[in-house]
Regions:
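Accessory beta-strand-rich segments of carbohydrate-active enzymes
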Residues: 63-67, 96-97, 101-213, 238, ...
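Bacterial Sec-dependent N-terminal signal peptides
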Residues: 1-21
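Conserved, mostly hydrophobic/aromatic
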Residues: 62, 138, 204, 284, ...
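Beta-strand-rich binding/interaction modules
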Residues: 136, 227-260, 266, 286-288
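Short hydrophobic beta-strand segments in globular cytosolic domains
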Residues: 141-142, 255, 328
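Aromatic-lined substrate-binding rim segments of carbohydrate-active enzymes
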Residues: 355-407
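N-terminal pre-domain segments of enzymes
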Residues: 20-55
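N-terminal carbohydrate-binding accessory modules
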Residues: 217-221, 287-359
């Protein structure tokens, strides 16, 4: 009987947690809105270009509060918000405006798995619009400015030995009242201008790493000589002695390997590589590892492709865009990346992929991403599906307040 009661209580708790969230307002919903699970929001690893096996997703229900700018952390919060959907969106469960005179506060707790003991813990944000201050256990550990770029913070020194830790994020976003890049966001949307996107709008996650660990991977293909040049960046206390190894795999088989000091350019030669093109979006897997004193301390998965994009004048002097040394007429839609229910954030990864697949099915080979930078998984799907991307810089204020006002 006791086991039955415990099982019922556990079930009731789960149901209650799920029942707390629901889309707010009466905005149009996509078909994927009903597939959003508050206990498992966007569960896919968010950084396909540098993927670690061990990680913890912090998406889900957080507490939120909207307060006048400059006030201290609230002692009580307004309710729950479903991260990573912006507070103005329906899928956040809130659908409230913040404005340039207020700040948006987030709060949640998290635990660090016992298996991560002895590791450094990185707290990663896919994107927060616009200025974010991050607190762990009531200590301001870092800030980031920029609504479209990811950032990571090493939170290890601020974990206090307790099993549960407090995470607070404070966000200020003036939208069109500021000078920052913001794309189509305005306080009073109309016509071609859309709703502001304030706060966390991409996945938040934790991952354990060694004190020396991989931080970046840059791969540049040369199809004319069959060489992939790879530069691996690392956080290291002994950069000269830390060695990276890169393996290039074709359908699971290693076809090239190179080793070197982190930060140096490694060249991997492949005979007759298969070239990437829209009709055959061929990708090579990469395994990248970092070793210290001969011991492997970090390993990530990545991918790349052999392709060349160039421009050349034809016999009539007209500049032609080329792919893999052949003329390619690129044609595709202007894609603004807005969702009626999630604003900047797609309801699910399936939804994110759908638009790309449908665009390809309509006969296009290119998407112009208009004044928005998408999550990394969007570009990954384009690579896999054979879609070229023209990337816009998100537009900002015409006043250029960051630039000098006098010129010689």
């Amino acid at each position: 009987m006791r086991k039955l009661l415990l099982a019922f209580c556990a079930f009731a708790t789960i149901c209650s947690a799920g029942a707390q969230w629901k889309p707010a307002g009466d905005k149009i919903k996509t078909d994927w809105a009903e597939k959003v699970d508050p206990r498992n929001v966007l569960p896919e690893y968010p950084r396909p270009g540098m993927e670690r096996a061990d990680w913890q997703n912090l998406n889900g229900e957080w507490e939120y509060a909207i307060l006048p700018k400059g006030q201290a952390e609230p002692t009580s919060f307004d309710g729950n918000i479903l991260v990573p959907f912006a507070v103005e969106s329906s899928l956040s469960g809130v659908q409230k405006e913040v404005g340039e005179k207020n700040e948006l506060w987030y709060k949640r707790t998290f635990t660090v798995p016992s298996s991560w003991k002895g590791k450094d813990i990185l707290l990663n944000f896919g994107a927060v619009d616009w200025k974010a201050d991050v607190f762990v256990n009531d200590i301001l550990i870092g800030s980031h400015t920029g609504g479209f770029t990811p950032f990571s913070l090493n939170i290890t020194p601020y974990l206090n030995g307790k099993s549960t830790h407090k995470l607070v994020v404070r966000v200020w976003d003036p939208s069109d009242k500021g000078y920052q890049p913001r794309g189509k966001q305005v306080a009073n949307p109309e016509g071609i201008w859309y709703t502001p996107v304030t706060g966390i709008w991409q996945t938040v996650w934790l991952e354990p790493v060694a004190s020396s660990h991989i931080t970046s991977i840059k791969a540049i293909p040369n199809i004319d000589n069959g060489v992939m040049s790879v530069t691996v960046g690392a956080c290291s206390d002994s950069p000269v002695s830390d060695i990276v190894e890169v393996s290039l795999l074709d359908k699971g088989q290693v076809v090239a390997t190179a080793k070197g000091v982190q930060g140096t350019e490694l060249r991997l030669a492949v005979q007759n590589p298969t070239l990437w093109e829209p009709s055959n979006p061929y990708l090579y897997d990469m395994k990248v590892s970092l070793s210290k004193n001969g011991k492997k301390v970090d390993e990530v998965k990545s991918y790349t492709a052999f392709r060349k994009i160039s421009a050349e004048r034809d016999a009539n002097g007209i500049m032609r865009m080329r792919l893999n040394n052949k003329n390619l007429f690129q044609y595709g839609p202007l894609d603004q990346g807005w969702w009626p229910d999630g604003l900047y954030t797609a309801p699910t990864d399936e939804a994110l992929l759908y638009d790309i697949v449908k665009t390809k099915a309509w006969g296009f080979n290119m998407i112009r991403k208009h004044v928005k930078v998408e999550p990394a998984r969007w570009y990954y799907h384009c690579d896999k599906e054979g879609m070229l991307v023209w990337q816009d810089m998100p537009s900002g204020d015409m006043g250029n307040q960051w630039a000098p006002h006098t010129y010689n």
